[in-house]
């Protein structure tokens, strides 16, 4: 009997856990290069994506083997030696399964990515790329129909948007700008601006507008984050300069 991975949650963690698959010639060449080939057989499975791939060395364990004496007909007569296999390590994640499911439900029919992090520890609580896929289909080789359905889908379910997608950071960058301003003494918590709803560069009449027409009025550092005040950070960016911003 042989054991295979089963992914009972299917799409829920597909882009986090990834999947295993049949070992390929390319995998074998990489294992040989890393001096790990002796621990694998040509019929083994190996991590192909996600954490399955990243932690393959820790999860795989040690392959066992038997040395058997056979007769002229190839039938086993006796076992000369046996080395039992050693199970791989158990990997525990910080992902909150309920939060993960809630995040996926919130996306509904829409595509997108979401990563939720515990600020105090840096632990990843949710890691979502929508839509997902069924990793069970890849374990023993995905069939042509399912592969074409995934590959040709306009929703690109095999694309890990949370990991490989390139998106403008938008307002998620504002708290980091605020921390940089405090560290560089460019702003104090009590520093306040009067926001008319736009910002003009020195010597220019062009209006760089805030998301809220008419502005937010009096805005200090704390309020600038709470209401996501664009004009506050336009001015801060000018005062800090590109080199200081890039260092953060």
Can you name each region flagged by the protein language model?
Residues 16, 102-106, 121-122, 166-193, ...:
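Active-site SXXK
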Residues 4, 21, 98, 121, ...:
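Short, glycine-/Ser/Thr-/acidic-enriched flexible segments
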Residues 75, 122-123:
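Residue-level signal for well-ordered, solvent-exposed loop/turn and beta-edge residues enriched
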Residues 114-119:
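Short hydrophobic alpha-helical segments used for membrane anchoring or interfacial signaling
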Residues 12, 47, 51, 55, ...:
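Stable alpha-helical elements in mature extracytoplasmic
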Residues 1-113, 128, 132-161, 166:
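Extracytoplasmic/periplasmic proteins that interact with beta-lactams or build/remodel peptidoglycan
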Residues 89-90, 157-162, 188-190, 194-246:
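Conserved catalytic neighborhood of penicillin-recognizing serine enzymes
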Residues 126-129, 204:
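Short acidic, glycine/serine/threonine-rich loops at helix termini
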């Amino acid at each position: 009997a042989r054991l295979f991975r089963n992914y009972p949650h299917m799409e829920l963690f597909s882009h986090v856990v990834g999947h295993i698959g049949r070992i390929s010639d390319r995998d074998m060449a990489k294992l040989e290069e890393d001096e790990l080939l002796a621990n694998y057989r040509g019929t083994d499975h190996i991590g192909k994506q996600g954490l399955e791939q990243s932690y393959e060395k820790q999860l795989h364990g040690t392959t066992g083997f038997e040395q058997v004496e056979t007769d002229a007909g190839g039938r086993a007569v006796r076992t000369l030696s046996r080395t039992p296999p050693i199970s791989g390590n158990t990997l525990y994640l910080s992902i909150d399964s309920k939060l993960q499911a809630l995040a996926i439900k919130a996306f509904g029919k829409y595509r997108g990515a979401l990563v939720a992090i515990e600020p105090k520890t840096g632990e990843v609580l949710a890691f979502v790329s929508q839509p997902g896929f069924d990793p069970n289909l890849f374990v023993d080789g995905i069939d042509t129909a399912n592969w074409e359905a995934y590959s040709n889908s306009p929703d690109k379910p095999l694309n890990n948007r949370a990991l490989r997608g390139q998106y403008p950071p938008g307002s998620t960058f504002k708290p980091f700008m605020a921390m940089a301003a405090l560290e560089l003494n460019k702003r104090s918590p009590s520093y306040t601006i009067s926001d008319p709803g736009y910002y003009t560069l020195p010597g220019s009449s062009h209006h760089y507008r805030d998301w809220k027409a008419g502005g937010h009025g009096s805005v200090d550092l704390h309020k600038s984050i709470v209401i996501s005040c664009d004009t506050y950070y336009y001015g801060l960016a000018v005062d800090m300069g590109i080199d200081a911003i890039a260092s953060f």
